[in-house]
């Protein structure tokens, strides 16, 4: 589930959106595929969908996985129970809308959705891409910031991205 907005109203993005394309390209299934783009939803709908993974947008800078983990309304959602809520990375640009960094987003998402199938060195790919795209060689701390390592700490599979 790509959570397009958390506050003031919950919103998700369904089929026909770049967010749906991203999920499918990474080998996932968008539980919100039946709705349109940026549709207002409620917690009951999220409960009915029972997503295994929740992706948090970058359009709300203060939105973190911890907010969902601490929100009692989300307590019974499988993604929350199993610590599979992820803040999408943001580097030279946000990774959730289509951009020159989208291939990195697809790699990141595939690593998290299918840890048993993929094992590429994402941090190296980020450094290489930023060198090519921006003429910038990020150090380990800069890559941690791109990947929101602190915000995603404790999420399943995130240790492999450190």
Q: What are these model-predicted stretches?
A:
Residues 1-162:
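N-terminal ligand-binding lobe of clamshell/alpha-beta domains
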């Amino acid at each position: 589930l790509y959570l397009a907005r958390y506050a003031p109203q919950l919103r998700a993005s369904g089929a026909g959106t770049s967010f749906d394309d991203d999920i499918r390209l990474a080998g996932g299934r968008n539980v919100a595929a039946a709705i349109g783009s940026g549709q207002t939803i409620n917690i009951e709908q999220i409960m009915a969908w029972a997503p295994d993974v929740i992706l948090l947008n970058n359009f709300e800078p203060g939105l973190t996985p911890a907010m969902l983990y601490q929100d009692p309304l989300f307590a019974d959602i499988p993604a929350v129970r199993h610590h599979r809520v992820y803040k999408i990375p943001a580097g030279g640009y946000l990774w959730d809308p289509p951009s020159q960094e989208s291939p990195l987003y697809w790699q990141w998402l595939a690593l998290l959705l299918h840890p048993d199938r993929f094992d590429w060195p994402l941090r190296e790919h980020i450094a290489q891409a930023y060198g090519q795209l921006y003429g910038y060689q990020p150090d380990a701390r800069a890559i941690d910031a791109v990947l929101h390592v602190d915000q995603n700490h404790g999420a399943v599979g995130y240790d492999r991205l450190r």
